[in-house]
Amino acid sequence: MTIKTGFDPDKFVQEAGDAIIAANSEGLIIFWNKAAERIFGYMTSEVLSHSLDLIIPERLRKRHWEGYQQVMQSGQTHYGSEVLRVPAVHKDGRHLSIAFTVTLLFSDDAHIHAIAAIIRDETARWDEERALRQRAAGIEAKNS
């Protein structure tokens, strides 16, 4: 039995407040929602079929791709239920702090077709925490 709800999953994914991005087995972007446009500054038309390197800081790319390939080969990731917090890069070059989880998308023949991530921009929170840490360190230095 199908219940008619008026719910449109495609619209939900496009309109979600968090970025939803998917990349194929080579790391090329195959899906980019409106929140991804807002967070990273790239329009969907600018990123489709381009590498995730657009949003990965250069210093972290080697480590990212090693992990990406390991997931592609093993078919397993522990970031599906764990939130990963990492730096990212906006189109204009500014640094972002993002938090995300991933899900593996399998093809009918049980091979990984893509990895999808749900991403939240936590830059403001990160900046606030850094300022608090610096302030606490200053207070400790004065009291030493």
Label each PLM-derived region with a short phrase.
Residues F100-V102, I119:
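Sensory-domain boundary capping and coupling elements
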Residues I3-E37, G80, S144:
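Sensory modules in modular signal-transduction proteins
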Residues F7, W126-S144:
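Sensory-domain boundary/capping and coupling elements
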Residues H111-A124:
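PAS-family sensory domains
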Residues K34-V47, D108-D109:
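PAS/PAS-like sensory domain cap-loop motif
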Residues T44, I56-S97, F106-D108:
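PAS/LOV-family and closely related PAS-like sensory domains
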Residues D53, F106, T123:
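Adenine-nucleotide cofactor-binding loop residues
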